[in-house]
Regions:
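Short helix-initiation/N-cap motifs at beta->coil->alpha
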Residues: 59-74
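Pocket-flanking alpha-helical
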Residues: 12, 87-93
Length: 174
């Protein structure tokens, strides 16, 4: 079992890739069960992470996201799987010319592909809240993704890449 701060990177974001490529190959956007067409590729990448890790494979379950970031910052690791929000921390050590975000190779012609995005986390509104609080929450979420100040805060202050055409362009290289 992975430490909870790393769990999402390898079992969620990384696992999105074989599912994405299978959906693309089959021309679908939903299914009751995947066929597993690209699961060998997922296993190969996961195995590579274990065999070429900065520590013994038996120690990986205790490693945290902070450990992973620090190993990258200290030059112990060449690659660091994470998201655009890590730019703030990494830019304290590295210049933009020293950083890049690259797709994870999954054995398909993906030279024009973008980067993996986690869709497992959604914004939620508590239906048990007061109508006033529900409306305030909805207004705030709308402000975050439609207003200049909101999208600027999300892209610059929080480091998120916002997939809306009206959003501010992120200032980080990721």
């Amino acid at each position: 079992m992975l430490f909870r701060s790393s769990d999402w990177r390898f079992k969620t974001h990384l696992a999105n890739l074989p599912i994405y490529y299978e959906y693309q190959a089959d021309g679908i956007d939903d299914t009751d069960a995947i066929k597993g067409t690209y699961l060998d590729n997922y296993k190969n990448v996961f195995d590579l992470y274990i065999t070429d890790s900065t520590c013994d494979g038996a120690e990986l379950s205790a490693k945290t996201a902070d450990d992973s970031r620090n190993e990258f910052i200290n030059g112990d690791a060449v690659f660091y799987q994470n998201g655009s929000w890590e730019y703030g921390e990494l830019s304290k050590t590295y210049s933009d010319d020293e950083l890049a975000m690259i797709p994870i190779y999954f054995g398909v012609d993906d030279e024009n592909e973008g980067l993996a995005t986690g869709t497992e986390n959604f914004w939620c509104v508590n239906k048990e809240a007061s109508e006033e609080d529900i409306q305030a929450t909805l207004d705030f979420m709308n402000w975050c993704v439609t207003s200049e100040d909101g999208t600027k805060a999300m892209s610059e202050d929080m480091g998120f890449t916002i997939p809306f055409k009206t959003a501010q362009e992120p200032t980080n290289v990721f």
